[in-house]
Amino acid sequence: MKNESWFVYILLCKDSTFYTGVTNDIKKRILAHENGKGAKYTKGRGPFKLLYKRAFETQSLALKEEIRIK
């Protein structure tokens, strides 16, 4: 079984808004946001500052935390 962490993260956008997301590759996902290939919400709102990240053992647990935060 592959040992893979899932992350909930919060980005601060340049317009002082926040974006919360879930990923299993935090560096790759933030790079996607920076390059305009992340979520529709973050397109044109970079650069971003990573304010928070927390690892979870499963995607399900990470998604539950994302919902709780939002």
Give the ranges of each region predicted by the language model.
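GIY-YIG nuclease catalytic motif and its immediate N-terminal context
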Residues: 1-39, 48-53, 61-70
